[in-house]
Each structure stands twice: as structure tokens, then as C-alpha cells.
């Protein structure tokens, strides 16, 4: 369904230009995306926009000109944004997602991951909007996978704790909200450092220098466009069925260590991998990580919700713009 609004546009004709008022179609379903400048947020914004939703994204440092600039710690600004736009759905992607940064800046991380999330849930409840809070597999300690939504969380690091506390703040302030736990993400990055998966590409490409790669932690790399599709499917199902709420899991289904991901990346681009060295010891530097926090996704699958991109396909799409050897890019893609 769409509504109609009037919009001004400039028409150029020989000798003059005219300001013309035209009717344009505006989708009637409204969605607000927080963290829309980030890797996941960009994908979620694109997914809803291309599916005929009236989509507004907000960010902070990189917001302008495409997105609304909003500090989520400013409760008054958040209130005005939500009450002015009146979204049917809010997808809350904004977070401090880097475990080591959370350890070094715990107060700032807690304000964003917990405080801002609870406030957003309260504002969503006030206008009857369906809130999807993006959480993490790091709420589990990784000792007894796979984890269902009913398993009791036990985070190992402060990042996992802030995400779990964020879940509690959301569900306490909004009984109709949904929590979507997801694992490590990758996708169309603006820079390699944007994802813990894509950041390995330089080490893969510089084959003249050996590189140590973690071969201890089991990960399930998941494409952001798959998570975005799940968010949209969840939102559309909720608009038909108010019982869609609570906690859900989504994840890719290919189990890999960072070493195995790096080898798969090398293989996808026909690059050598003999310089990559698997390290099987538990990492001793940085925030503690769960060994295997695999998520059981059967709850969403039973609802008919899901999408999975094979890792080799997704990583090739994501990384080819960062290829150092441009000859390979030309022969494969042109």
C-alpha cells in the first residue's frame, strides 16, 4: 500500500526553468533503522527500502546527508525523531560491537548498548512500534553449543554482558519487542576493518609474509544481507501476527575458524594460502571469547523465515573491490 504526497521538482525547458508540484507515491509502511551508517545498518536500510517500505535511517558521525543525524544518548532527540516519523517498525542496529573497545571504554559502551536501547524500547512502546533489537551470540559462553533461545546466557566478556543487559532493558520496557541474536558478520564493507572477517583480506593477499591466524574459536560468518532479509521478514510477519515477539536466533551454517575463513578467501580468489599459519591455542590477548557459540535457528526456520548466502559466494562479492591484483578483477568480472 502507498499514500500520496506532493513534492516540488524543477523542470528545465528551453529559455527557463519551472518549479512544478507533483504527486509522488509514498509507501505506507514506515521503518526506522538506527546505526544505518554501519555495515549491518546499511544492508537493513537497503532491504526495507527495496521492499517498498518508507525507510528512514539515523546515524551519528557519518549520518549526513543520506541519514538523520541523531545522538541515541539524547533521549529528547530520540523522542522527537520517533514521534515525528511514527514508524511501524524500528530495527535497532546501533551498538558498540568491538569487544576490546568495550573492555577499554565500559561506561560509554554500556550507555549505548544498554541505556539507549532501553530508552528506544520505551519510545517504541509508546507509539506501538515493533522494535527489533540486534544482539549477539556472545551472550553465551561457548561451552555447550548449539544454543536455543531458551538456553540461559552466560557471557564471558563485557561486550556480551552489555548486549545481554541491552536485551533485558528492551524486553522490560517493551513486552512486544523482538531480540535477534546474530554471530560475526561480513558484507559489502566501506573499509576492510569494518568486519572481523574482511579485515583478514590484506593478510591473505600479502603472501610474501607469514601470518598467524586463530584456529581455535569456531565462528559462523553471516552475510549482512541475510540478516537484513530476516529482519524484514520478521517485521512483515509481525504486522500480520502480533504473537511474533521475544527472542530469535539467526546465523550462517558454515562453521569455520578465522584460519579456515582466510583459506576460503584465498581459494575464492585463487590466491596462495601456504603463508597462513593456524594457531590452535586459546587467545590470551584482548577480551575473552567463547570457543563455540553456535546459534540454533530452528525457531525462525519453523516460521518460514530465513536466508543464507554461501560463504564463498558472499565473500567474493564483498572483497573483490579490495583486490590488489587488478588483473584478476578484470578477467573474472568483465
From Swiss-Prot:
Pathway: Amino-acid biosynthesis; S-adenosyl-L-methionine biosynthesis; S-adenosyl-L-methionine from L-methionine: step 1/1. Belongs to the dTDP-4-dehydrorhamnose reductase family. MAT2B subfamily. The keyword Glycoprotein does not apply. The modification Phosphothreonine is found at residue 309. GO terms for biological process: one-carbon metabolic process; S-adenosylmethionine biosynthetic process. Gene3D superfamilies: NAD(P)-binding Rossmann-like Domain (3.40.50.720). Keywords: NADP, One-carbon metabolism, Phosphoprotein. Heterotrimer; composed of a catalytic MAT2A homodimer that binds one regulatory MAT2B chain. Heterohexamer; composed of a central, catalytic MAT2A homotetramer flanked on either side by a regulatory MAT2B chain. NADP binding increases the affinity for MAT2A. PANTHER family: DTDP-4-DEHYDRORHAMNOSE REDUCTASE (PTHR10491), METHIONINE ADENOSYLTRANSFERASE 2 SUBUNIT BETA (PTHR10491:SF4). Residues 319-334 are annotated as: Required for interaction with MAT2A. Pfam families: RmlD_sub_bind. The gene is Mat2b. One of its GO terms (cellular component) is nucleus. SUPFAM superfamilies: NAD(P)-binding Rossmann-fold domains. Regulatory subunit of S-adenosylmethionine synthetase 2, an enzyme that catalyzes the formation of S-adenosylmethionine from methionine and ATP. Regulates MAT2A catalytic activity by changing its kinetic properties, increasing its affinity for L-methionine. Can bind NADP (in vitro). This is Methionine adenosyltransferase 2 subunit beta. One of its GO terms (molecular function) is methionine adenosyltransferase regulator activity. NADP(+) binds at residues 37-40, 60-62, 71-72, 93, 97, 159, 185. The keyword Phosphoprotein applies.
Amino acid at each position: 500500500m502507498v499514500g500520496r504526497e506532493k513534492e516540488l521538482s524543477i523542470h528545465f525547458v528551453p529559455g527557463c526553468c519551472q518549479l512544478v508540484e507533483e504527486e509522488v507515491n509514498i509507501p505506507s509502511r514506515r521503518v526506522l533503522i538506527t546505526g544505518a551508517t554501519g555495515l549491518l545498518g546499511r544492508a537493513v536500510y537497503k532491504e526495507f527500502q527495496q521492499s517498498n517500505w518508507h525507510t528512514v535511517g539515523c546515524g551519528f558521525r557519518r549520518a549526513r546527508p543520506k541519514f538523520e543525524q541523531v545522538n541515541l544518548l539524547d533521549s529528547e532527540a530520540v523522542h522527537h525523531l520517533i514521534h515525528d516519523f511514527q514508524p511501524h517498525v524500528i530495527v535497532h542496529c546501533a551498538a558498540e560491537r568491538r569487544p576490546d573497545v568495550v573492555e577499554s571504554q565500559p561506561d560509554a559502551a554500556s550507555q549505548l548498548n544498554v541505556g539507549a536501547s532501553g530508552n528506544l524500547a520505551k519510545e517504541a512502546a509508546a507509539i506501538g512500534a515493533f522494535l527489533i533489537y540486534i544482539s549477539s551470540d556472545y551472550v553465551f559462553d561457548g561451552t555447550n553449543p548449539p544454543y536455543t533461545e531458551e538456553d540461559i546466557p552466560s557471557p564471558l566478556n563485557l561486550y556480551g554482558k552489555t548486549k545481554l543487559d541491552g536485551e533485558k532493558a528492551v524486553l522490560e520496557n517493551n513486552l512486544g519487542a523482538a531480540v535477534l541474536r546474530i554471530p560475526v558478520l561480513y558484507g559489502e564493507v566501506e573499509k576492510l576493518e569494518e568486519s572481523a572477517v574482511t579485515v583478514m583480506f590484506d593478510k591473505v593477499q600479502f603472501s610474501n609474509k607469514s601470518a598467524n591466524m586463530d584456529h581455535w574459536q569456531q565462528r559462523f560468518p553471516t552475510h549482512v544481507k541475510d540478516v537484513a532479509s530476516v529482519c524484514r521478514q520478521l517485521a512483515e510477519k509481525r504486522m500480520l501476527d502480533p504473537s511474533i515477539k521475544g527472542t530469535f536466533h539467526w546465523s550462517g551454517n558454515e562453521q569455520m575458524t578465522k584460519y579456515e575463513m582466510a583459506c576460503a578467501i584465498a581459494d575464492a580468489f585463487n590466491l596462495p594460502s601456504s603463508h597462513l599459519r593456524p594457531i590452535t591455542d586459546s587467545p590470551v590477548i584482548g577480551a575473552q571469547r567463547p570457543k563455540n557459540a553456535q546459534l540454533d535457528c530452528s525457531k525462525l526456520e519453523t516460521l518460514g523465515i530465513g536466508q543464507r548466502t554461501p560463504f564463498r559466494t558472499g565473500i567474493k562479492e564483498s572483497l573483490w573491490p579490495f583486490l590488489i591484483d587488478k588483473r584478476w578483477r578484470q578477467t573474472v568480472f568483465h
